[in-house]
């Protein structure tokens, strides 16, 4: 039996759009009528409008005092061929106050055949003749990638990274334990995960990454995935110009200095004015702006203030020769009227692509936020800076901005972010504003003269900036509501056909472990309605979508790593989530991840929460497939929790603390400390608090390196026993209907 990687042959169905090109050539004898021509010579321009496409209104430049203008300007419209598309042509006269309509004509696009190109004359007022050149073609190369497979760049990265990892594992594990690494195919895929938890997660993850870097574990990892606070550390690390040549130790020193300041210092009038003016520029270009944009700027100014122009795309240079693990970031797409615990689509971000695996739709990072229609960009914007994405990835804190800044009266609303979030519904997070303020279809024909328009825009800008500044620096009504604080971007799936849904694991028998029974799937971990509507599709008619912190559903980025295309063997996860006390069970987020995985038919080891009762609180727990022979595609999970146990006694693994000063620095609680220095809402870490949390997670990681090494050795053995791991035979494909028919009909070697 031959084994294949079938994902590249699964067809993600999508309908092709049409590209309608209009060249406005010229006009002759433009007139305002006999009386009008006596008073003024026309200043003509042409406006084109098709109501059925998002970027619907376009216009030529105007010519002063010209009755025979020659424009030769080309415009493109992306159209849905199933719609009744009608081009409306309006001849306009530019005036100082309000432009004047000289004539209107219409043209049914359906009268043209695909591949046809022709010149069409239009007569206005029985005198003026205008010539347009029109052509219609199929958009056969959309800007979205429709596929269940990983992108070619990630595939290339994986191949290069495996060669690097093979040598690193041999060095780390020694000749005896690595004798099974004969080729790149024998190399297990290791992923490192960081949870959310605000600056607590960021600081804790900084200690983790330092330990993984020093121990050589990081050199054996293919992926590093983060959520919320962990993404802030990943962004800081990967955007640093000296990484990876300079390791986390020196970069963490810079981080400690950056987070020692009160974030309120960033809200000086001069800086606030600069923030809001840059957001006005974004808003006036036609992009949505929310409080998350401002929060992203504050996070960026705190963590990456000397590289605020860095983009996600620019991080490719950090992995272009597979010298580092590939960073993966995440947020959620949510609906305005549905709880994020019931419905949420996971959006993944890498330096190579951004997209949603649930729909098999991906795009280059520089296109995220641009206007799309039917998979094609209709209006391209500049790539959003990394700090904007940092605000989106951690947007729970913009939703609860009053807690972050300590606005009066807000401190009594709950001691942890999780308690606050329990009271949030998506309708609190997301404004119900489905309209487009930049929607050309609602604009009147014509525009004001540029001089008059600039005066109006200046007044409008001043008013908007004033409102935003007052909302930001005062205890205004905006701080007493969570409305509209979610990130908002143009819907890149606008107009697509989602009649066919694609399970995250579209191949049967891919996960052969014992499946959950109905009672287990029905059992609630955190909420009776959790994941109830996760199979629902996105609204492809909504012009904008809301993107929020993934921690609002569960606080570990497992969905990125569990994609079967990535074939991860070993997951090392670090959970910095808040708990009621230091002695509380630490598995809530992991149990939610397990339930989500089972509902999506993805391999996941059985999480036994009673291990806490049997073994007590530990620095890490190992969860393995019960039957590796049957569950050959199930990963092993090493789950680190935030706990101060052995660190109190040892300053390094095996090195006891001796002096009172050494013992005192390590004698602290995480969640039981009444002063809450490690609160989820603490955005200022004095050096001592930073060092304590950083050094704790650095120690906990190093103290369990042997556990990680042992799991690596076992993963190598699993690979040896199952050389076809994460490959699938065609006879086991449940979703044959998704496959390219030509591929299915080919004879197999």
UniProtKB/Swiss-Prot annotation:
Segments forming domain PLA2c: 140-740
Cross-link Glycyl lysine isopeptide (Lys-Gly) (interchain with G-Cter in SUMO2) per UniProt, renumbered positions: 541, 606
Biological process according to GO: arachidonate metabolic process; glycerol metabolic process; leukotriene biosynthetic process; monoacylglycerol biosynthetic process; phosphatidylcholine catabolic process; phosphatidylglycerol catabolic process; prostaglandin biosynthetic process
Molecular function (Gene Ontology), one example: phosphatidylinositol-3-phosphate binding
The keyword Nucleotide-binding is assigned to this record: no
Domain notes: The N-terminal C2 domain associates with lipid membranes upon calcium binding. It modulates enzyme activity by presenting the active site to its substrate in response to elevations of cytosolic calcium. In the presence of phosphoinositides, regulates phospholipase A2 and lysophospholipase activities in a calcium-independent way.
Protein name: Cytosolic phospholipase A2
Natural source organism: Pongo abelii (Sumatran orangutan)
Upper taxonomic lineage: Eukaryota, Metazoa, Chordata, Craniata, Vertebrata
Gene behind this protein: PLA2G4A
């Amino acid at each position: 039996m031959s084994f294949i990687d079938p994902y590249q042959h699964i067809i993600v169905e999508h309908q092709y759009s049409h590209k309608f090109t209009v060249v406005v050539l010229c006009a002759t004898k433009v007139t305002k009528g006999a009386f009008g021509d006596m008073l003024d010579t026309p200043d003509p321009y042409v406006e084109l409008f098709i109501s059925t496409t998002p970027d619907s209104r376009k216009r030529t430049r105007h010519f002063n005092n010209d009755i025979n203008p020659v424009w030769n300007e080309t415009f493109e419209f992306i159209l849905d061929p199933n719609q009744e598309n009608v081009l409306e042509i309006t001849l306009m006269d530019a005036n100082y106050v309000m432009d004047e309509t000289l004539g209107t004509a219409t043209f049914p696009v359906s009268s043209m055949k695909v591949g046809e190109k022709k010149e069409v004359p239009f007569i206005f007022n029985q005198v003026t003749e205008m010539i347009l050149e029109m052509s219609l073609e199929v958009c056969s190369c959309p800007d979205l990638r429709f596929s269940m497979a990983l992108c070619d760049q990630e595939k290339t990265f994986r191949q290069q990274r495996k060669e690097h990892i093979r040598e690193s594992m041999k060095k780390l594990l020694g000749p005896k334990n690595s004798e099974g690494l004969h080729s790149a195919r024998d190399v297990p895929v290791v992923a490192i995960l960081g949870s959310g938890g605000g600056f607590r997660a960021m600081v804790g993850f900084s200690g983790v990454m330092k330990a993984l870097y020093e121990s050589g574990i990081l050199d054996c990892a293919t992926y590093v995935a983060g959520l919320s606070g962990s993404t802030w550390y990943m962004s800081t690390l990967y955007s640093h110009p000296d990484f990876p040549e300079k390791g986390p130790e020196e970069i963490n020193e810079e981080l400690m200095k950056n987070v020692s300041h009160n974030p309120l210092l960033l809200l000086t009038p001069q800086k606030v004015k600069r923030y809001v003016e840059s957001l006005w520029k974004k808003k006036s270009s036609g992009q949505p702006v929310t409080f998350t944009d401002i929060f992203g700027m504050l996070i960026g100014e705190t963590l990456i203030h000397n590289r605020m122009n860095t983009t996600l795309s620019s991080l490719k240079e950090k992995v272009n020769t597979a010298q580092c693990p590939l960073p993966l970031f995440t947020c959620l797409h949510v609906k305005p009227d549905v709880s994020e615990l019931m419905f949420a689509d996971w959006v993944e971000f890498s330096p190579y692509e951004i997209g949603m695996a649930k729909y098999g739709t991906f795009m280059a990072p520089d296109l995220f936020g641009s206007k799309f229609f039917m998979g094609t960009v209709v209006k391209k914007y500049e790539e959003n800076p990394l700090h904007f994405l940092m605000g989106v990835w951690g947007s729970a804190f913009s939703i609860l901005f009053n807690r972050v800044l300590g606005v009066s009266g807000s401190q009594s609303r709950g001691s942890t972010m999780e308690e606050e979030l329990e009271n949030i519904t998506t309708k609190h997070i997301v404004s119900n504003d489905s309209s487009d303020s930049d929607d050309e279809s609602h604009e009147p024909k014509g525009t004001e003269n540029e001089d008059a328009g600039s005066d109006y825009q200046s007044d409008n800008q001043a008013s908007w900036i004033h409102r935003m500044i007052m909302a930001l620096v005062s205890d205004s009504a905006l701080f007493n509501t969570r409305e509209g604080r979610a990130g908002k971007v143009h819907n890149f799936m606008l107009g697509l056909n989602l009649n066919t849904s694609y399970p995250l694991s579209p191949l049967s028998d891919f996960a052969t472990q014992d499946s959950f029974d109905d009672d287990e799937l029905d059992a609630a971990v955190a909420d009776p309605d959790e994941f109830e509507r996760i199979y629902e599709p996105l609204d492809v008619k909504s012009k904008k979508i809301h993107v929020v912190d993934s921690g609002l559903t569960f606080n570990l980025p497992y969905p990125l790593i569990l994609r079967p295309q990535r074939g991860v063997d070993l997951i090392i996860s670090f959970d910095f989530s808040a708990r009621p006390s230091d002695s509380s069970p630490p598995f809530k987020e992991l149990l939610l991840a397990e339930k989500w995985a089972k509902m999506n038919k993805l391999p996941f080891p059985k999480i036994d929460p009673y291990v806490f009762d049997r073994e007590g609180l530990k620095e890490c727990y190992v969860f393995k497939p019960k039957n590796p022979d049957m569950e050959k595609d199930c990963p092993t999970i090493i789950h680190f929790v935030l706990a101060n146990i052995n660190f109190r006694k040892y300053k390094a693994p095996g090195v006891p603390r001796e002096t009172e000063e050494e013992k005192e620095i390590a004698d602290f609680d995480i969640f039981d400390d009444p002063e809450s220095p490690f609160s989820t809402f603490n955005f200022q870490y004095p050096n001592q608090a930073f060092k304590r949390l950083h050094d704790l997670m650095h120690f906990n990681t190093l103290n369990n390196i042997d556990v990680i090494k042992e799991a690596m050795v076992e993963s190598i053995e699993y690979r040896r026993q199952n050389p076809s791991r994460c490959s699938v035979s065609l006879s086991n494909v449940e979703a044959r209907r998704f496959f390219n028919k030509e591929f299915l009909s080919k004879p197999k070697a």
